[in-house]
Amino acid sequence: MSRSVLQPSQQKLAEKLTILNDRGVGMLTRLYNIKKACGDPKAKPSYLIDKNLESAVKFIVRKFPAVETRNNNQQLAQLQKEKSEILKNLALYYFTFVDVMEFKDHVCDLLNTIDVCQVFFDITVNFDLTKNYLDLTVTYTTLMILLSRIEERKAIIGLYNYAHEMTHGASDREYPRLGQMIVDYENPLKKMMEEFVPHSKSLSDALISLQMVYPRRNLSADQWRNAQLLSLISAPSTMLNPAQSDTMPCEYLSLDAMEKWIIFGFILCHGMLNTEATALNLWKLALQSSSCLSLFRDEVFHIHKAAEDLFVNIRGYNKRINDIRECKEAAVSHAGSMHRERRKFLRSALKELATVLSDQPGLLGPKALFVFMALSFARDEIIWLLRHADNMPKKSADDFIDKHIAELIFYMEELRAHVRKYGPVMQRYYVQYLSGFDAVVLNELVQNLSVCPEDESIIMSSFVNTMTSLSVKQVEDGEVFDFRGMRLDWFRLQAYTSVSKASLSLADHRELGKMMNTIIFHTKMVDSLVEMLVETSDLSIFCFYSRAFEKMFQQCLELPSQSRYSIAFPLLCTHFMSCTHELCPEERHHIGDRSLSLCNMFLDEMAKQARNLITDICTEQCTLSDQLLPKHCAKTISQAVNKKSKKQTGKKGEPEREKPGVESMRKNRLVVTNLDKLHTALSELCFSINYVPNMAVWEHTFTPREYLTSHLEIRFTKSIVGMTMYNQATQEIAKPSELLTSVRAYMTVLQSIENYVQIDITRVFNNVLLQQTQHLDSHGEPTITSLYTNWYLETLLRQVSNGHIAYFPAMKAFVNLPTENELTFNAEEYSDISEMRSLSELLGPYGMKFLSESLMWHISSQVAELKKLVVENVDVLTQMRTSFDKPDQMAALFKRLSSVDSVLKRMTIIGVILSFRSLAQEALRDVLSYHIPFLVSSIEDFKDHIPRETDMKVAMNVYELSSAAGLPCEIDPALVVALSSQKSENISPEEEYKIACLLMVFVAVSLPTLASNVMSQYSPAIEGHCNNIHCLAKAINQIAAALFTIHKGSIEDRLKEFLALASSSLLKIGQETDKTTTRNRESVYLLLDMIVQESPFLTMDLLESCFPYVLLRNAYHAVYKQSVTSSA
């Protein structure tokens, strides 16, 4: 070989190692995806499972790598038909295998060049060169093992080549070599052991240089603890001193990587195990630490079995085989417990480190090495556990189940967050370090070199100049630093000075190598913090252990003490994209989608768990609030009364019931109630949810708090509806006051959540409670507004119209009447003023408006029926309207009227509905006056000062505003809207107006018939009649006002007409002699007074002109006298 070939600068070892290592990872990624695709029936190339091609595939695999297209037409006939599709669809697979072959060629060339150059390797001196060399060896080995694991490789390559031959008349030019490689590497390690015989010297030198690094890293937890490893506070006096080491990059070098180097390296150059005691010690130590190694992602390599299978066929290796068996037994017995103790130590060490650095972030400067060591150590232990979890021995299964793994991952994430947050602090420190110390020391070292060739001198001078030119101002100005060129120059310099016969030999100037390694670490602290975090703490491997990942998460949530660390799992999803490679861009979407789905699932589960805890607390609080309801004090009052009256009972008295609040009396602080446990668990979980405001996963931003907010909204909605306890079958529903108590208790708990998590609980209340004021919520589910509206209309008011319930004006409530069939509910408990106020609180103005509109819809249907009755009697009523002063004619006409009772019944039903509405409106007014007194008083003032000459449309707008605030109006806007929607297309407005007028006539002339009804007796105690005819007053006034507003008539004139007709009709009762007909005459007379009292349009003077006041006075006297007699 010529001298020029041996010149290191022309060999470009540094560049080749860098490029080939990166390309090797890319090739591994592509092969891994091919293996996974072939293992998945859904993703497998269809030609491998096509029944028509089955015989062809078997033939190709059997003959592989030979190509026999002749005399096999029958077997390959189907292949001939699909050759173009096969070429198209299998090209990516085929050329990936070709790329692997080319990669192998390049690696072999480089390994040969390194051997020829007799490169010196020492991980503590030329770190980058040695690491990249060992990485390349392991990557190459892993690639060939992974290739041998693709069972369909022969079928894919063979199918493609046959299709190529059929299409182009010749095999693919790469096929012969590729086919031979596939055959040669059937047993890849055996083949590579032969292949690496020439490289044994270089490889063993590199591996043996680990003797100072690997044993120091592979210590037990007790040794770490005794050395107070990673502790910043063990020696307070040296806390500000920079963490230094002669082997800076080796301190955070992955233990996992070193074990792969040692295991695979000494398998390839196994001869050294027999000649070098150091090699044997390293090999045995690595074998005792693990049962399997991670080849790539979730592909593992069972080291003991593989090594034994390889050595068993080598003569004189019985001793090595015994070593392997002993190490296997040691790994099975002790490795699990050793790694468990390490994780236990690292949890406390990382916690201490994270706590100190969060308090004093300035220590990230001098102690940066500790941070990256801690991250690397923890990452190694987590990966070890992950790959062994599926391959654990049954004897010591507990050592491979770590329920506290979340805590370790959490502290890793905390340290990562500190590094990202305080990056500028570290930059300032290391910029000063590089310019003020490293540049000076390096300059002295260079000056003291006995020999320094020109090329090397130029490179090292550029190092000194680059560092000297640095200043803190660059950091303050936000300048972007880039030392990649400097680091590549040092890599090149390592290659130049590590070959044999180099003028400046790095082996003779170890101090220079160690100093430069330290400087390189310092430069990384300035410009490559993110890359350093990926190098030392990347856990993207979890992406390929989805089942184990989810299981760890579930264990974390199940253990209350660990739930505070559950945020670590969603945070890990941010790592996933770092495992992608540019040589395999097609997997980015797959991995990205997996990261999104897992992150979403974790955050959703955390929010659900928190929601469930909150729900349990709310349930407990609702129970406690329920105990304070007035109904529960009845028993206490009863006991007190009995005690006062000294009633002696034969039996012993019942044990005294515990009073509400007794649960708060603590006699012992060790006693932990269920509520305490729930609050503790909630605070732990909320810490996790509140840990980060948001996280970015594959160009998506996740906000953990929003998950909790949305879950709370959904659960609060369901809980409110659930607490109504509405049963459609039995028509049972919770009293509004009890529901309000429960809702307030629920809201109090939800408000306390703001103490744990920074969420806007007011927004939750607004969203949920506003939706509950509508007919349906955003999911189309019924709300408390629709449930209570239906119940009051279909249950309470229906029973009123059936005569089982009466409206008592004196009590402002509906009350059950004594009947044969007792009702399942007490009407008073749902309709008194306190219940109606509670209903108004719950439904709010919107909900009460919906209730009103529903009531008006029922009234409008009754009015429609009344109009039909008027139309049936239109001729008679027209005559009666003009003949009220002709008694005989009126009597004759009255007899011709039909459906008189139906008219009165329907008007009474309308009156009952309007009475209920007035209760609801009054309650709403009271509630709003309490919450918004100034606004209500302004609306009231506005309503009371509408000028009489105001346009009716304007007035109706004011009335609508007033009605929404619960204020009574002369004309009910809701009723006007309901009745105006009834206008018939076939009837002219004049005809509609006439029907409205005749309706009032019909009601007026029908009133006397009420006197004959037994139930029409007026009761002074309730200020009404038991058959609810006192509600007619409200019905007549409101219906008249609404109808004549719609038809633009004079309300006052029509009511005067009604009063004249009604008083004339009632006066005739006085002349009747039949006692049955007149039994409740006085009670019916009072209706006139009620109508006038209720009306804003009629006066007592007007009534006096139609109906003698003396009759009213006598009627009141008579009914009160009758009431006293009945009571007696």
UniProtKB/Swiss-Prot annotation:
Positions carrying N-acetylserine: 2
Q: Main site of residence?
A: membrane
Q: Which GO terms describe its biological process?
A: apical protein localization; basal protein localization; cell migration involved in gastrulation; embryonic body morphogenesis; embryonic foregut morphogenesis; embryonic heart tube development; endoderm development; establishment or maintenance of actin cytoskeleton polarity
**Keywords, ordered alphabetically:** Acetylation, Cell membrane, Cell projection, Cytoplasm, Membrane, Transmembrane, Transmembrane helix
Which intervals carry biased composition (Basic and acidic residues)?
A: 651-665
Q: Which GO terms describe its molecular function?
A: small GTPase binding
Chain spans, region Disordered: 640-665
Location of this chain's protein in the cell: Cell membrane; Cell projection, Lamellipodium membrane; Cytoplasm
Q: Which sequence ranges are marked TM in the entry? A: 995-1015
Distribution of this protein across tissues and organs: High expression in cerebral cortex, not in cerebellar cortex.
InterPro entries the record matches: Nck-associated_protein-1
How does it sit in the bilayer? Single-pass membrane protein
> One Gene Ontology cellular component annotation?
SCAR complex
* One Pfam entry name: Nckap1
Q: Hey, which family's this protein in? A: Belongs to the HEM-1/HEM-2 family.
Subunit-level organization? Associates preferentially with the first SH3 domain of NCK. Component of the WAVE1 complex composed of ABI2, CYFIP1 or CYFIP2, BRK1, NCKAP1 and WASF1/WAVE1. Within the complex, a heterodimer containing NCKAP1 and CYFIP1 interacts with a heterotrimer formed by WAVE1, ABI2 and BRK1. Component of the WAVE2 complex composed of ABI1, CYFIP1/SRA1, NCKAP1/NAP1 and WASF2/WAVE2. CYFIP2 binds to activated RAC1 which causes the complex to dissociate, releasing activated WASF1. The complex can also be activated by NCK1. Interacts with NYAP1, NYAP2 and MYO16. Interacts with TMEM132D.
| Role played | Part of the WAVE complex that regulates lamellipodia formation. The WAVE complex regulates actin filament reorganization via its interaction with the Arp2/3 complex. Actin remodeling activity is regulated by RAC1. As component of the WAVE1 complex, required for BDNF-NTRK2 endocytic trafficking and signaling from early endosomes.
Name the chain's protein.
Nck-associated protein 1
Phylogenetic placement of the source organism: Eukaryota, Metazoa, Chordata, Craniata, Vertebrata
Q: Gene that codes for this?
A: Nckap1
